[in-house]
Amino acid sequence: MSNANPFFSQSLAERDASVRGAILKELERQQSQVELIASENIVSRAVLDAQGSVLTNKYAEGYPGKRYYGGCEFADEVEALAIDRVKQIFNAGHANVQPHSGAQANGAVMLALAKPGDTVLGMSLDAGGHLTHGAKPALSGKWFNAVQYGVSRDTMLIDYDQVEELAQQHKPSLIIAGFSAYPRKLDFARFRAIADSVGAKLMVDMAHIAGVIAAGRHANPVEHAHVVTSTTHKTLRGPRGGFVLTNDEEIAKKINSAVFPGLQGGPLMHVIAGKAVAFGEALTDDFKTYIDRVLANAQALGDVLKAGGVDLVTGGTDNHLLLVDLRPKGLKGAQVEQALERSGITCNKNGIPFDAEKPTITSGIRLGTPAGTTRGFGAAEFREVGRLILEVFDALRTNPAGDHATEQRVRREIFALCERFPIY
């Protein structure tokens, strides 16, 4: 229409060139770099479309059928789809898909099942846990008496005997099983037995491995835990957000009240639409094939790195992530993160268990295969990426501030690799 309101017709490029320019530069970065950050992935065009939809306009405080605003008929439809699909994926009786993030999901569980001052037992951040599991800077470390378990110095594996001893000693009301940098499977049955022995509730934070569990390649924590939290991105390959699952109806009621009105107001309906799409994708056989490739690619990348002279914490991986110990190369995590980014490879510096370096320096990096696998990389491509990473490592040993020639050459090879597997 010739008299159309430009507010509704002008594109982002026409209305705000500065923001559009930044987005285009980020798109180019994602297209031309290899993403190895283990907590990142690449969503489908369908998820992008859902998250950029008119649902961003809709306030929908409450839950389907029980909203505090009118006009929620179709918001209800979208949220019901998300709930039904995620329940089907994980064989759960109840689901809340409104948490804006994994941290919000974890906070909701703590609000529902613990009181300020209660003891909470979780994995320490320096052993591979997450901030929200009782780290001192986080709310969970300030409002609760946070006791932390770790890993064995000999094996770098979770010390379940220590977990049990700490539980018996401190009698927590909530035990948390989950991680942000732990490459091995979790024994949910053992965690539940420990929780039952002291009358604690067990919360599993499956954020990193939700996709692996969805594909049936890891035990399902819903069968063991009182409550399960997760993000919707990472291996599940959805938009950034969270959700909570339980088979206990009374806990489900408490969780719903904790999410709204306890922690949040209106849900982000456009994000919930993206979640619904991603959950639908996770129910397909193609998704199971994808996860199998994620796991195989992690093995391929790890094999190359080990052969090249670095150590992998625990000696390898059972999932999508690798925790790389750089000490055999005499390198630091921050130094390597920066050099790899200059070379077209993004990862993050990460402490290793019993690390002597500061968190801003670290002795390790964390790598993951979900994003590269999404864009189509197979084992051959990840072996090539591993070879290029080792070249950057070895150049840093000679030139600790960075070897420009090596980094530029690697960057060209990475760019050529990415061009073979385009995104968007």
Swiss-Prot record:
Cofactor(s) for this UniProt protein: pyridoxal 5'-phosphate
Recorded GO MF terms: glycine hydroxymethyltransferase activity; pyridoxal phosphate binding
EC number: 2.1.2.1
Oligomer and partners: Homodimer.
CDD domains per UniProt: SHMT
Location within or outside the cell: Cytoplasm
Top-rank taxon, per record: Bacteria
Reaction catalysed by this enzyme: (6R)-5,10-methylene-5,6,7,8-tetrahydrofolate + glycine + H2O = (6S)-5,6,7,8-tetrahydrofolate + L-serine
SUPFAM superfamilies: PLP-dependent transferases (SSF53383)
InterPro entries: PyrdxlP-dep_Trfase, PyrdxlP-dep_Trfase_major, PyrdxlP-dep_Trfase_small, Ser_HO-MeTrfase, Ser_HO-MeTrfase-like, Ser_HO-MeTrfase_PLP_BS, SHMT-like_dom
Gene behind this protein: glyA2
Name of protein: Serine hydroxymethyltransferase 2
Organism taxonomic ancestry: Bacteria, Pseudomonadati, Pseudomonadota, Betaproteobacteria, Burkholderiales
Top-rank EC class of the record's enzyme: transferase
